Amino acid sequence: MTTILRIDSSIKGEAAVSRRLTQRILDRLLEAHPDATVVSRDLAQGIRQIDGPWLGSVFTAPEQRTADQQEIARTAGAVMAEVKEADILVIALPVYNFGAPAQLKSWVDHIARRGESFVYTETGPVGLLTGKRAIVAFTSDGTPLGSELDHASGWLRQVLGFVGITDVDFVAADRMVFGADEAMARAEAAVAALAA
Protein backbone atom coordinates (compact mmCIF):
# COMPACT_ATOMS: atom_id res chain seq x y z
CA MET A 1 0.00 0.00 0.00
CA THR A 2 1.19 3.51 -0.83
CA THR A 3 1.79 6.05 1.93
CA ILE A 4 1.61 9.74 1.06
CA LEU A 5 3.05 12.35 3.40
CA ARG A 6 1.56 15.82 2.98
CA ILE A 7 3.59 18.70 4.39
CA ASP A 8 1.90 22.11 4.53
CA SER A 9 3.97 25.08 5.64
CA SER A 10 2.13 28.32 4.97
CA ILE A 11 1.24 30.65 7.82
CA LYS A 12 -1.98 31.51 5.92
CA GLY A 13 -3.66 28.24 6.90
CA GLU A 14 -6.71 27.28 4.85
CA ALA A 15 -6.42 30.50 2.81
CA ALA A 16 -2.98 29.55 1.47
CA VAL A 17 -2.56 28.97 -2.25
CA SER A 18 0.08 26.36 -1.44
CA ARG A 19 -2.47 24.43 0.64
CA ARG A 20 -4.95 24.49 -2.24
CA LEU A 21 -2.21 23.21 -4.49
CA THR A 22 -1.07 20.42 -2.15
CA GLN A 23 -4.72 19.34 -1.93
CA ARG A 24 -5.03 19.25 -5.74
CA ILE A 25 -1.82 17.21 -5.98
CA LEU A 26 -3.09 14.87 -3.27
CA ASP A 27 -6.42 14.46 -5.08
CA ARG A 28 -4.54 13.59 -8.29
CA LEU A 29 -2.41 11.00 -6.48
CA LEU A 30 -5.46 9.46 -4.81
CA GLU A 31 -7.03 8.93 -8.24
CA ALA A 32 -4.16 6.55 -9.01
CA HIS A 33 -3.74 5.24 -5.45
CA PRO A 34 -7.26 5.17 -3.97
CA ASP A 35 -6.20 2.92 -1.08
CA ALA A 36 -3.24 5.08 -0.11
CA THR A 37 -2.67 6.08 3.49
CA VAL A 38 -2.34 9.86 3.83
CA VAL A 39 -0.36 11.37 6.69
CA SER A 40 -0.56 15.15 7.08
CA ARG A 41 1.65 17.55 8.99
CA ASP A 42 0.94 21.28 9.11
CA LEU A 43 4.23 22.91 10.04
CA ALA A 44 2.54 26.25 10.73
CA GLN A 45 0.90 24.55 13.72
CA GLY A 46 4.34 24.19 15.20
CA ILE A 47 7.57 22.32 14.75
CA ARG A 48 10.46 22.78 17.11
CA GLN A 49 13.42 24.67 15.77
CA ILE A 50 16.60 22.76 16.40
CA ASP A 51 18.62 24.09 19.30
CA GLY A 52 21.13 22.85 21.86
CA PRO A 53 18.65 20.72 23.84
CA TRP A 54 17.31 19.19 20.58
CA LEU A 55 20.81 18.35 19.39
CA GLY A 56 21.74 16.86 22.75
CA SER A 57 18.58 14.77 22.78
CA VAL A 58 18.72 13.18 19.34
CA PHE A 59 22.43 12.40 19.57
CA THR A 60 22.38 10.97 23.10
CA ALA A 61 22.00 7.20 23.44
CA PRO A 62 18.37 6.38 24.38
CA GLU A 63 19.33 4.75 27.67
CA GLN A 64 21.26 7.88 28.71
CA ARG A 65 18.56 10.46 27.95
CA THR A 66 16.87 12.49 30.66
CA ALA A 67 13.06 12.64 30.74
CA ASP A 68 13.12 15.96 28.86
CA GLN A 69 15.52 14.53 26.28
CA GLN A 70 13.30 11.48 25.82
CA GLU A 71 10.32 13.70 24.98
CA ILE A 72 12.32 15.81 22.52
CA ALA A 73 13.76 12.67 20.88
CA ARG A 74 10.30 11.08 20.68
CA THR A 75 8.91 14.07 18.79
CA ALA A 76 11.96 14.29 16.51
CA GLY A 77 11.68 10.55 15.87
CA ALA A 78 8.03 10.89 14.88
CA VAL A 79 8.89 13.51 12.25
CA MET A 80 11.65 11.28 10.87
CA ALA A 81 9.42 8.19 10.89
CA GLU A 82 6.79 9.97 8.79
CA VAL A 83 9.35 10.58 6.06
CA LYS A 84 10.87 7.10 6.26
CA GLU A 85 7.45 5.46 5.98
CA ALA A 86 6.27 7.63 3.07
CA ASP A 87 6.44 6.53 -0.53
CA ILE A 88 5.42 9.95 -1.86
CA LEU A 89 5.93 13.34 -0.24
CA VAL A 90 3.75 16.31 -1.19
CA ILE A 91 5.48 19.42 0.12
CA ALA A 92 4.14 22.98 0.16
CA LEU A 93 6.84 25.53 -0.61
CA PRO A 94 5.41 29.04 -0.35
CA VAL A 95 8.13 31.59 -1.02
CA TYR A 96 8.66 34.23 1.65
CA ASN A 97 11.21 36.93 0.80
CA PHE A 98 12.82 34.77 -1.90
CA GLY A 99 13.27 31.72 0.37
CA ALA A 100 11.49 28.94 2.21
CA PRO A 101 9.43 29.55 5.35
CA ALA A 102 11.29 29.11 8.63
CA GLN A 103 9.02 26.24 9.65
CA LEU A 104 9.90 24.30 6.48
CA LYS A 105 13.59 24.87 7.22
CA SER A 106 12.99 23.47 10.72
CA TRP A 107 11.32 20.38 9.23
CA VAL A 108 14.34 19.89 6.95
CA ASP A 109 16.62 20.19 9.98
CA HIS A 110 14.61 17.41 11.63
CA ILE A 111 14.93 15.04 8.68
CA ALA A 112 18.51 15.72 7.51
CA ARG A 113 20.23 13.68 10.21
CA ARG A 114 23.41 11.67 9.93
CA GLY A 115 22.75 8.01 10.54
CA GLU A 116 19.01 8.43 9.95
CA SER A 117 18.64 9.91 6.46
CA PHE A 118 22.24 9.98 5.24
CA VAL A 119 25.67 8.61 6.08
CA TYR A 120 29.18 9.75 5.32
CA THR A 121 31.35 7.30 3.41
CA GLU A 122 34.92 7.44 2.13
CA THR A 123 33.56 8.79 -1.15
CA GLY A 124 31.21 11.35 0.41
CA PRO A 125 27.67 11.51 1.77
CA VAL A 126 25.08 8.93 0.73
CA GLY A 127 21.35 9.51 1.15
CA LEU A 128 19.37 6.72 2.79
CA LEU A 129 15.82 7.77 1.84
CA THR A 130 15.93 6.30 -1.65
CA GLY A 131 13.00 5.03 -3.68
CA LYS A 132 10.73 7.92 -2.72
CA ARG A 133 9.08 10.59 -4.82
CA ALA A 134 8.51 14.23 -3.87
CA ILE A 135 6.08 16.64 -5.48
CA VAL A 136 6.59 20.24 -4.42
CA ALA A 137 3.85 22.88 -4.58
CA PHE A 138 5.82 26.07 -5.22
CA THR A 139 3.87 29.30 -4.73
CA SER A 140 4.93 32.92 -4.81
CA ASP A 141 3.60 36.42 -5.21
CA GLY A 142 6.38 37.58 -7.51
CA THR A 143 9.28 35.11 -7.57
CA PRO A 144 9.41 32.94 -10.71
CA LEU A 145 10.25 29.27 -10.12
CA GLY A 146 13.89 28.63 -10.97
CA SER A 147 14.79 32.29 -11.43
CA GLU A 148 17.80 34.00 -9.87
CA LEU A 149 15.38 35.40 -7.27
CA ASP A 150 14.26 31.91 -6.26
CA HIS A 151 16.39 30.76 -3.34
CA ALA A 152 13.84 28.15 -2.27
CA SER A 153 13.34 25.50 -4.96
CA GLY A 154 17.02 24.76 -5.60
CA TRP A 155 17.67 24.54 -1.87
CA LEU A 156 14.81 22.09 -1.33
CA ARG A 157 15.81 19.96 -4.33
CA GLN A 158 19.40 19.88 -2.99
CA VAL A 159 18.33 18.86 0.52
CA LEU A 160 15.96 16.17 -0.74
CA GLY A 161 18.66 14.79 -3.03
CA PHE A 162 21.18 14.83 -0.18
CA VAL A 163 18.95 12.50 1.86
CA GLY A 164 18.32 10.27 -1.17
CA ILE A 165 15.06 11.64 -2.62
CA THR A 166 16.01 12.41 -6.21
CA ASP A 167 12.64 11.94 -7.95
CA VAL A 168 11.38 15.50 -7.41
CA ASP A 169 8.73 17.37 -9.41
CA PHE A 170 7.68 20.99 -8.95
CA VAL A 171 4.19 22.32 -9.60
CA ALA A 172 4.25 26.11 -9.60
CA ALA A 173 1.64 28.77 -8.98
CA ASP A 174 4.21 31.52 -9.12
CA ARG A 175 4.08 35.27 -9.79
CA MET A 176 0.52 35.40 -8.46
CA VAL A 177 0.46 39.22 -8.27
CA PHE A 178 0.96 39.34 -12.04
CA GLY A 179 -2.09 37.18 -12.75
CA ALA A 180 -3.45 34.81 -10.12
CA ASP A 181 -5.96 33.15 -12.44
CA GLU A 182 -3.33 32.44 -15.07
CA ALA A 183 -0.87 31.14 -12.46
CA MET A 184 -3.48 28.79 -11.01
CA ALA A 185 -4.48 27.61 -14.49
CA ARG A 186 -0.84 26.73 -15.22
CA ALA A 187 -0.58 24.94 -11.88
CA GLU A 188 -3.82 23.01 -12.50
CA ALA A 189 -2.52 21.91 -15.90
CA ALA A 190 0.75 20.77 -14.31
CA VAL A 191 -1.17 18.78 -11.68
CA ALA A 192 -3.28 17.14 -14.38
CA ALA A 193 -0.12 16.20 -16.29
CA LEU A 194 1.55 14.60 -13.26
CA ALA A 195 2.30 10.93 -13.67
CA ALA A 196 0.52 9.54 -10.64
Curated annotation (Swiss-Prot):
Keywords: Flavoprotein, FMN, NAD, Oxidoreductase. The keyword Oxidoreductase applies. FMN binds at residue 10. It catalyses: 2 a quinone + NADH + H(+) = 2 a 1,4-benzosemiquinone + NAD(+); N,N-dimethyl-1,4-phenylenediamine + anthranilate + 2 NAD(+) = 2-(4-dimethylaminophenyl)diazenylbenzoate + 2 NADH + 2 H(+). Its EC number is 1.6.5.-, 1.7.1.17. Its cofactor is FMN. Belongs to the azoreductase type 1 family. This is FMN-dependent NADH:quinone oxidoreductase. It comes from Cereibacter sphaeroides (strain ATCC 17023 / DSM 158 / JCM 6121 / CCUG 31486 / LMG 2827 / NBRC 12203 / NCIMB 8253 / ATH 2.4.1.). The gene is azoR.
